[in-house]
Amino acid sequence: ALGSAINPAAISYRLKLLKDMGCDAIRTSHNIPSPELARQCDSLGFMLLVEPFDEWDIAKCDSGYHPYFNEWAENDVAQMVRVFRNHPSVVLWGIGNEIPNQLDNDGWRTVKRLQDVCHREDPTRPVTVCMDQVATVLTNDFARDIDIPGINYRTHKYYDAKATWTQGMILGSETASTVSSRGVYKFPVKMKLGATYDDHQSSGYDVEACPWSNVPDIDFELAER
């Protein structure tokens, strides 16, 4: 592999922009980040969720991680933890995002196996899996052993998750996904999901979201309850 080059000044610039807008946490979706990102997060006071891959042994795309998962997953997760465990900015390990194995009744076995690797290499930090098939994982065993279950969108399932899972905490691992076009205003102003228009633009009033998501106002309301 050729690897990649990074620009520390560019990382610093981006982090300071985020900090200026009030951001204090970053999720490295969905790949292992550069050590330089973790170093600068240490310096600037960010919290960091580090995760290694976007799929397990079931493909989500032709060029994904699935051909290597069975042979390399445990090693790659262990190496990830060893590289980043001494960074104070790291508060959480991730071991999967929107994994198709959520629909598998045996998916919990892989969760436990990878989580055990994280605990072995670093017993001080919790582990999450970020899930989108929330209705399914509320009825099978996929999420039963996850330290802190993560929910992608599906805010209407938060209360069901809290009542069903015994961990006592859930993570909003992906939340609002609003779409807008600068300088374009649609009337009448209405909240819409997956809206399409002949001019291929969205309303600039921040009232439209992707079909799988919601506008930020929903998250703000939940946070205030």
Give residue spans per PLM region:
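Glycine/Thr-rich phosphate-binding loops of Rossmann-like dinucleotide-binding domains
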Residues: 36, 103, 137, 159, ...
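Catalytic metal-binding/acid-base residues of hydrolase active sites
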Residues: 53, 96-100, 132-133, 154, ...
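Short acidic loop-to-helix transition motifs that present clustered carboxylates
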Residues: 32-35, 131-136, 154-157
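Substrate-binding clefts and catalytic carboxylate motifs of secreted carbohydrate-active enzymes
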Residues: 91-93, 109-130, 141-143, 157-225
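Structural motif corresponding to alpha-helix initiation and N-cap regions
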Residues: 12, 74-78, 136, 155, ...
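Short active-site oxyanion
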Residues: 24-26, 144-149
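Short hydrophobic/aromatic-enriched beta-strand-loop microsegments
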Residues: 45-52, 147-153, 169-175
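Active-site-adjacent substrate/metal-binding segments within catalytic domains
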Residues: 1-112, 123, 127-128
